[in-house]
Amino acid sequence: MNREIRTDLAIELRENVADRRNMPGVKVKTVVNEDRSIKTTTITVLDEIGEKNLGKAKGQYITIECSKLKEYEESIHEPLRAELEGRLRELMGHAGNILVVGLGNRQVTPDSIGPLVIDNLYVTRHLDTPGKPDLVMSAICPGVMAQTGIETVDIVRGICDEIDVEIVVAIDALAARSSKRLGCTIQLTDTGISPGSGVGNNRKTLSSDNLGRRVIAVGVPTVTVSYTHLRAHETRSNL
């Protein structure tokens, strides 16, 4: 029986390839900060060959790893914040009208990261500021289809068209293969995202094809798939 390991992380898909150094169509670059507390890996899927080899759509997948992310220390969070900001700016370019979408169900803990981010976001679209601000930010928590009866992509598309959004930044929970990556890994990608993918409930994708504007997805793994734990248990039992 072919039991594949489920993961949303491009870096884990690459790790699962036997000959990871020879993957046509896939480019990989890794950077570690000065004190080696933050590792950033950029995986670029260049073409259809790369899509087939990695199992991910063409585009960039940036993975920021920091094992100390769970610690409540400003000295740890500040360099991580700077790294995340820098990578986001690289992907976003000079877009001025941004919609941040907090995907997920705030009533389900592992699926609530999107709404929690929105709760702590400083939005600016409603502010009456002199001149034209460099960045206009608005935000929405569209809920999940079981709550609204509406596909998330339809809600977001309507908002984008109404307020002329240039770029969508979607925040969501992801699924990881390794429990060691839970809560201490951030993946950014310019390929969009399927709402609910982290909890196994894929809906229509938030993508440039479906929304008519660029989509940046930011995800944090909050769950692993049961088979991952089962395989680990079987391995220990056979020792």
Feature-to-residue mapping (PLM):
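N-terminal amphipathic/basic leader segments beginning at the initiator methionine
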Residues: 1-58
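An N-terminal, well-structured beta->alpha segment
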Residues: 49-93
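Short glycine-rich or small-residue beta-strand-to-loop segments that form or flank ligand, phosphate
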Residues: 65-67, 97-108, 139-143
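Gly/Ser/Thr-rich loops at beta-strand to alpha-helix junctions
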Residues: 103-113, 146, 173-177
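Glycine-rich phosphate/diphosphate-binding loop of Rossmann-like nucleotide-binding domains
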Residues: 105-133, 139
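A structural-propensity feature for long, helix-poor, extended segments
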Residues: 136-159
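Glycine-rich phosphate-binding loop
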Residues: 153-204
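Conserved small/polar residues in nucleotide/adenosyl-binding loops
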Residues: 228-235
